[in-house]
Amino acid sequence: GCLRFCLVSVLVMIIAFKMLVYFIICLLTVKVTSEVVDTSHGKVAGKLFKSFIKNVEYYGFLGIPFAAPPLQDLRFKPPQDIEPWDKVLLAKNEKPACIQFNTNLLKGQRLGQYGVEDCLYLDIFTPGTDRNERPVVTFLYNERFQNSYNKTKDYGPDFFIEEDVVVITISHRLTAFGFLSLEDTTVPGNAGLKDIVKALEWVKDNIGNFGGDPNKITLLGSQGGAVAADLLLHTGAKHLINAAILQSGTALSPMYLQDNAAERAFLLGEQLEIYTKNKEKLLKELNKVSASDILSKEVRAAPKEFYKENQKSVLTFGPVVENDSDGLLTKYPEDSTEKINIPIMIGQTSREGLASSLNYLTRPTDLRYINKDFPFLLPMRLKYKFDPNHDAYYEAIEDIRKFYFTKNKITEKSISDYITYVGDVLTYYSINKMADMYSNSSSRVYYYNFDYYSDLNENKNNILRMSNIEEGTWGAATGDELCYIFKCPRLKDKLCISVTAITTNTKNKIKFIFRGGSHTRNVIFLLRIWNFHKILNCINCTLIINNKIKIK
């Protein structure tokens, strides 16, 4: 029984990559009728859709509340219980995203502020409500806990639906609204993470009524969503997760788990002309300020020189380690001693540094300024901590320059070297280390690298359109695998033509075969064993996804 469950959980994780072969897709979404389902809080009515490729009918239940609206005095607090409803809730339209400020040019979204504070809702897409044994994929996607793109206009569930998998998307609070902390029990922080936990609890209690198995829940996180999933696996909420996929993100990245959380809250207050050193007064006044004003001022609330002194990027608000022993996240993941005995797929794209290098791809001459102000971003929590007031700090920078940059020189021709460096320090080092940590904690870890390129590589193609040079832009950019596992409506013109990509023959090869009933612990892929990741002598442990899919 345990072995069978583990194998099924792994199957859920790798179904995503089976979808690499669907490239001829025509948009067809039809509202036909509705379905009413009982939940722990009341009845909900969804609507019927049809999928892209096979016209498979499925139900969508959109905008189901899982917590009380986080308004007024609840603005920065952990999520509270939602009141039950008596009438049938019409769950037929998606709710707005959580309030955020979009600066990402790559997604084609409207720049600036959008979203609302009343945003704690989830969406469920199911092939049917007739039986409660389908695997469940819960999708989390945010970028650095500042922006979120997990609505159907961004990523649709069709490909999973056609594999008879239930898909759930969760909206959680972002920026200061989700991660302001006063470092006390009044506002301990991590409200956005606690939103996810609240939603997962609701899913655990109710997904059986939507055709899903509450014991087959896979958390699929991309970028900041992967960080959130990673963090939750190191908390008491891990029992809500039966398997996990971490795409291009872990909590070990130098971008996350910032210090000085309360100081940041007071700096935000000063930006909003709230001058006080009293936490209760600060909270009271912040609750009176408009959400728009908070969002526009929070970027200025990072401590001065924080970037240089702490080897971290300047994200004003994000997840924190809580001081309260009863909090959600009370230890750094690397200090956790808990066993995490579930299947985990973890990996990255081949050129994670592309998006972070966009400024230099558009203005290569600006690279010369790096000679004077080198971005020293080695993850300090992985024993790479250096004091900028000591010679060792500058000696380390010199060693890095010698290792990454040809002849130790950074010029406008160094863009390829810079992309490699940024990808390593912000993503690859921390992902490799986290894979090692999970391996040591008894988890069954499957490691992959996505290196495929076609018209479906949305981020890479947008980067190329904005770049003035192509040097160093080989491979796949961060997030490029998403449009191979989810329907991307904005690429429908690309999806409705034959793309030069993995052929139908590859479709027949991409099959994971499980030896039911035997004692093997590994996966058979392309007639070769995809071994668990391990620290030393790891042979056939990495799945390479490109034109010639292979294991090495």
Regions found by a protein language model. Name each.
Residues 1-25:
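Classical eukaryotic N-terminal signal peptides for Sec-dependent ER targeting/secretion
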Residues 108, 198, 205, 238, ...:
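Substrate-access "cap/lid" subdomains that shape
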Residues 195, 223-225:
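Active-site loop->helix "elbow" adjoining a glycine-rich segment at hydrolase catalytic centers
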Residues 212-222:
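Alpha/beta-hydrolase fold nucleophile elbow
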Residues 420, 428-546, 552:
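Mobile gating loops/cap/lid regions near enzyme active sites that modulate substrate access
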